[in-house]
Amino acid sequence: MARNKPLARKLRLAAAYKENRPVPIWVSVKTRLKVRRGFRLRHWRRTKLKV
C-alpha cells in the first residue's frame, strides 16, 4: 500500500483497526460465557478490507 494515503482511506483503515478487537471480559462475565468471541474479528491475512 502506498505510503501517502488519502485522508478518507486513512480514516477507514483507522476505523477498521479500532473495531477489530476481542469481546471485553465483562461481557463474557455478564453473559456467563455465552458470548466468547466477537463474530466480526478479522485477521489481516485471511480477510482483506474493501478499501
Curated annotation (Swiss-Prot):
Keyword DNA-binding: no
Single Gene Ontology BP annotation: translation
An MF annotation (GO) of this entry: structural constituent of ribosome
Gene Ontology cellular component list: ribonucleoprotein complex; ribosome
Keywords noted in UniProt: Ribonucleoprotein, Ribosomal protein
InterPro entries: Ribosomal_eL39, Ribosomal_eL39_dom_sf
Endpoints of the signal sequence: none
SUPFAM superfamilies listed in its UniProt record: Ribosomal protein L39e
Superkingdom, natural source: Archaea
Keyword Ribosomal protein: yes
Family according to the record: Belongs to the eukaryotic ribosomal protein eL39 family.
Name of the protein in question: Large ribosomal subunit protein eL39
Species of origin: Staphylothermus marinus (strain ATCC 43588 / DSM 3639 / JCM 9404 / F1)
